[in-house]
């Protein structure tokens, strides 16, 4: 590997609006202090995060590359040109760890193809923290992203994941758009078998954090308001 190349730092961010230094190690602060080029999903929120970590850092001097659903795949290799010229780049997620349920994975793959060193930094991952605290199988689990919006398709997918969990003894993880969270927990309680375990991990790392695992039947009786709150759902059928 060419040691004169810059490195691609994978920089975790907070999962909410709490103090970054409550959940991020000092190394993250140091890397941000020493980096002026960033690949981000949203420039406004990324700049706000950088300012909270390093208030003294000059914002006008930052170079920002946008990586979101509007970014052309053909543009991605050029984002890493500074690394080829010996300059480090930071890859930021909107929340949590870059490359995990995050478009940053495409840039990381290109970095490997170009023999650019990839350096993951320590930080919160809502997916891992949810499975850690669920009491479910942390040896075998799968993240399934978003479930279908259509009522019939969603019901079929919930039943399919329940079957997979039972057949493979595998925890099934998924998410929902926050304003549909309450509908999701209602659907899980009504569609799953009564003894299937359901974990709701909401507002992870925040002062309003709520994490609870109980059966689908118990969720019918114990209501919780998840509206517009970042939530991870996990099911496991024994």
Language-model features: locations:
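Short glycine-rich anion-binding loops that position phosphate/pyrophosphate groups of nucleotides
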Residues: 15-17, 94-98, 178-179, 238
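A contiguous loop/helix-start segment that scaffolds small-molecule binding in enzyme catalytic cores
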Residues: 2, 6-9, 87-88, 166-238
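Conserved helicase motor
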Residues: 65-72, 147-151
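Class I SAM-dependent methyltransferase SAM-binding "motif I" and its flanking Rossmann-like core
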Residues: 9, 106-164
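Glycine/small-residue-rich loop that forms an oxyanion/phosphate-binding "nest" at active or ligand-binding sites
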Residues: 68, 76-118
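Glycine-rich, flexible N-terminal cofactor/catalytic loop recognition
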Residues: 1-67
């Amino acid at each position: 590997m060419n040691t004169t190349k810059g490195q691609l730092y994978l920089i975790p961010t907070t999962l909410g609006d709490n103090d970054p230094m409550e959940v991020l190690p000092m190394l993250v602060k140091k890397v941000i202090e020493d980096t002026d080029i960033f690949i981000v999903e949203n420039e406004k929120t990324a700049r706000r995060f950088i300012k909270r970590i390093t208030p003294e850092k000059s914002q006008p001097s930052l170079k920002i590359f946008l990586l979101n659903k509007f970014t052309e795949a053909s543009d991605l290799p050029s984002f890493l040109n500074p690394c080829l010229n010996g300059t480090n780049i930071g890859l930021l997620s909107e929340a949590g760890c870059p490359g995990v349920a995050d478009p940053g994975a495409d840039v990381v793959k290109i970095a490997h193809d170009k023999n650019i060193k990839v350096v993951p930094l320590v930080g919160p991952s809502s997916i891992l923290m949810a499975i850690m605290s669920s009491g479910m199988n942390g040896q075998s689990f799968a993240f399934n992203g978003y479930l279908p919006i259509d009522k019939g398709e969603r019901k079929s997918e919930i039943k399919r994941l329940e079957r997979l969990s039972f057949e493979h003894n595998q925890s099934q993880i998924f998410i929902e758009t926050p304003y549909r969270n309450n509908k999701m927990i209602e659907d899980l309680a009504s569609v799953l078998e009564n003894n299937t375990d359901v974990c709701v991990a909401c507002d992870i790392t925040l002062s309003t954090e709520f994490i609870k695992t109980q059966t689908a039947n118990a969720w019918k009786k114990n209501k919780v308001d998840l509206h517009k709150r970042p939530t991870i759902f996990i099911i496991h059928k024994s």
